[in-house]
A protein has these predicted regions:
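Ligand-binding clefts of soluble mixed alpha/beta catalytic domains
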Residues: 1-264
Length: 264
């Protein structure tokens, strides 16, 4: 885990003088490898702090979130600050209606405390540490299709949780991995495979909750039935399929039209 401090932390292979001497480029420390760059663009940093005191507080929260002693919880766990009954109004009946999965997390974890992992990087995929009924867990949720950067983020988080023995909870609501020329150029297949490999190799207990849509390969990457979760819960309006109905109908129509065109 890497904690970076705004306007103070910098990571790069070569500093401004060497970059200027080697390739003639004028660049500042922040432009080459500042905290904001690594928190939002490269994904090198996991947590972005405002100052040194904030960085120490983040480190303390992280140490508290990891199950170092593997001791079962003693005594009652704190209830969520936000009322779980509000979940009925947060998760929409129409799976196509967007919502923020963080609002769901805030209503199921102890004290509504969620230490988000790479919060400013690839916000389509939400990862972080929390406790549920006193048990420390890692949570992965979706805010739409899984981008290539989201695949990298989720794969790293799963591997870290596996190393620390932290059980994983998956909150599925995705149309699958992002498609299109931009996604392909960004390495959708390569990075998506990393995510699927990570969930396949995770030895910790895995639990899956389908909140909305769960389509295509996204179902695999988010620990669908094929990857042996301890159980799968499904929201009453959840949908699981190879692809959405509208997309399937359009594909079949295009295939039929192409077949008719070939036959004259």
């Amino acid at each position: 885990y890497v904690v970076l401090v705004k306007n103070r932390s910098s990571i790069y292979l070569a500093g401004p003088p060497l970059v200027k001497a080697a390739i003639g480029e004028d660049a500042t420390d922040e432009e080459l490898g500042g905290a904001d760059l690594h928190a939002t663009v490269t994904g090198l940093g996991e947590y972005l702090a405002d100052n040194d005191a904030h960085a120490i507080a983040i480190a303390r929260d992280l140490f508290e979130a990891l199950p170092w002693d593997a001791v079962l919880p003693s005594g009652p766990a704190p209830l969520p600050v936000h009322d779980p009954e509000e979940l009925m109004g947060i998760v929409p009946a129409d799976e196509r209606t967007p919502y923020d999965v963080r609002e769901v997390i805030a209503r199921i974890v102890d004290a509504s405390r969620f230490l988000e992992f790479k919060a400013a990087y690839s916000t389509d995929t939400i990862c972080g540490h929390a406790s549920i009924d006193g048990h420390r867990v890692g949570i992965i949720g979706n805010n739409g299709p899984i981008q290539p950067t989201g695949s990298v983020k989720a794969a790293q988080f799963m591997q870290l949780c596996d190393q620390s023995g932290t059980p994983l909870v998956f909150l599925q609501n995705t149309t699958g991995y992002m498609v299109g020329s931009a996604a392909e150029r960004a390495g959708a297949i390569k990075h998506g495979a990393k995510m699927i490999q990570a969930v396949a190799n995770a030895r910790v207990p895995k639990f899956t909750i389908v909140l909305g849509g769960s389509y295509g390969a996204g179902n695999y990457g988010m620990c669908g039935r094929g990857f042996d979760p301890r159980f799968i819960f499904a929201w009453p309006t959840a949908r699981t399929a190879v692809m959405g109905g509208a997309q399937a109908a359009m594909v079949m129509e295009m295939v039929s039209r192409a077949k008719l065109a070939r036959s004259g």
